[in-house]
A protein has these predicted regions:
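Gly/Ser/Thr-rich loop/hinge elements
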Residues: 148-206, 212
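P-loop NTPase catalytic core of nucleic-acid-dependent motor ATPases
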Residues: 141
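Short, well-ordered, mixed-charge alpha-helical segments that flank or form enzyme active sites
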Residues: 17, 109-110, 148-150, 215-216
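Stable alpha-helical elements in mature extracytoplasmic
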Residues: 23-26, 120-127, 150-157, 216-220
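Residue-level signal for short, function-critical loop segments
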Residues: 104, 145, 210-212
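Residue-level signal for short segments within beta-strands and strand-turn junctions
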Residues: 56-58, 209, 219
Length: 221
């Protein structure tokens, strides 16, 4: 007999975005719009692009209830670069040097339709060279919000993660139905000469996944 209403949770915040400027953080609950608790009747109100006032809150223990905490004003949306690299870190635990990368989509550059732009791929290689220079020997790859993208980006990422002695070997077989069987191909891991500067020669890999992990992400897993 209790009332029900829609709420939303912040999964992550892009750098230099209106959400970051407003102080939104991962894990914040949006309880209402224009300061009215439970006013999210349609999620499109959060996608409208206009300036809105949000009522934020937090969970109350294990009661499945929420309490309001603060109100923030979110400025009108504007274009910001949605890079695949949300967070990268290196943690030391005993004799372990643990690399962490949250990689949110497989794209070679900012323009998903311009395959000639490989600036993201170049950055990925440089990032792994940094991991290697810091003697990373364990790795956590966070693909919880990665819905896929370009297969050649997955090919590069896999080549940077695998054991050195399997570089150049088959990564996957791309097999089409009988109408396009002429497109079937075996996609190999890149050669040692192409990724040696950043290949971590890992013996194992920890992958974080979620309900939206799909497509090219599954190739890595």
């Amino acid at each position: 007999g209790g009332s029900t209403y829609k709420i939303a949770i912040v999964l992550y915040v892009l750098k230099d975005s209106p959400a970051e400027e407003a102080g939104l953080k991962r894990g914040d609950w949006i309880l209402g719009v224009i300061g009215s608790l439970g006013s999210i009747q349609d999620y499109d109100v959060l996608r409208s692009g206009g300036s809105v006032s949000l009522q934020l809150g937090k969970e109350i223990g294990n009661t499945k209830g929420f309490v309001s905490t603060r109100r923030v004003t979110l400025n009108a949306s504007r274009t910001v670069e949605d890079t695949p690299f949300l967070k990268d870190s290196v943690y030391t635990y005993g004799n372990k040097r643990i690399g962490y990368l949250m990689y949110n989509h497989f794209a070679s550059g900012p323009d998903e339709y311009d395959y000639s732009d490989t600036s993201y791929n170049l950055y990925l290689q440089q990032l792994f060279e940094k991991f290697k220079s810091r003697n990373v020997n364990e790795f956590v790859l966070d693909l919880r919000y990665n819905g896929g993208g370009l297969v050649n980006c997955a090919q590069l990422l896999a080549s940077l993660l695998v054991r050195e002695n399997v570089l150049g070997e088959p990564l996957c077989i791309m097999e089409y139905n009988d109408k396009n069987s002429n497109k079937n191909e075996t996609l190999p891991l890149l050669k040692t000469t192409e990724v040696m500067a950043g290949n971590l020669n890992l013996q194992r890999l920890f992958v974080l996944t979620g309900s939206t992990t799909a497509s090219a992400s599954e190739l890595i897993i």
